[in-house]
Amino acid sequence: NKFGFFPSVAAGWRLSEEQFFKEAESLSFIDNLKLKASYGILGNNNIGNYPYQSTYALGKAMNYVFGGVYTQGAAVTTYVDPTLKWEKTRTTDVGIETAFWKNKLTFNAAYFYRKTTDILYKPSASYSSIFGLALSQVNTGSLENKGWEFEIGHQNKVGEFSYHVNGNFSIIKNKVISLGVGDVEQKSGMIGNGSNLFLGYPMNMFYGYKTDGVFLTDEEVKEWHDQSKIAPNSKAGDLRYVDISGDGKVDEADKAYLGSKIPQYTFGLGLG
């Protein structure tokens, strides 16, 4: 599947240019009012050259005996997925652009929804070594990003002095929809990069043990749940870990979602 089709479309309606809008005196303070929307599909094939071809290697391990003679051999070293195709990202945007009082005040807002499917990645430790071959790039998993973007600005001129102020604020929510490979949760990432991947949670999440303050005395250590498996020799001043499973001890079963490495809120401010 070396070829792909990635259409896009965008439309806008500037209401402030309509005759009915210009004739409305109550709306004269609005210089610009525009509604806009877009939809598009982007493709990603950033996986190197010829990922759809199997590779062969020469070496002693591939040699073979023919007619009593030890002969140079070659063998396939990489298994290629014959259904490999483009990773696709579908994006929908809707928004509004406004300007008021001779463009002294501007305000823009937009909502976006972005879904990525057939994510390309190359497994490393996610399959058995008994297989005997390396795996090429494969398509698996999907995720979504959605959120809001806001921008507000003010510009003016006082005598010979001109200035402008603008600020922006965005909200984004990231969620793993599918992991492929049977939706097996990846506690160390699909490619062994330490990023925990769980269905319904953000990518690059923090996954670990919850704490409940620190031990104030050694007596508290004795009365607390057994946490010797993760923090042996705990004493006063050490962290107290929560027994989420309720089995009286703190171990691997007590790990939980702690948050995302991807910031949910971002903002900026500009002056000039």
Can you describe what each PLM-predicted range is?
Residues 54-56, 60, 213, 245, ...:
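Generic alpha-helical secondary structure signal
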Residues 82, 246, 263:
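Single, functionally critical "micro-switch" positions that shape active/binding sites
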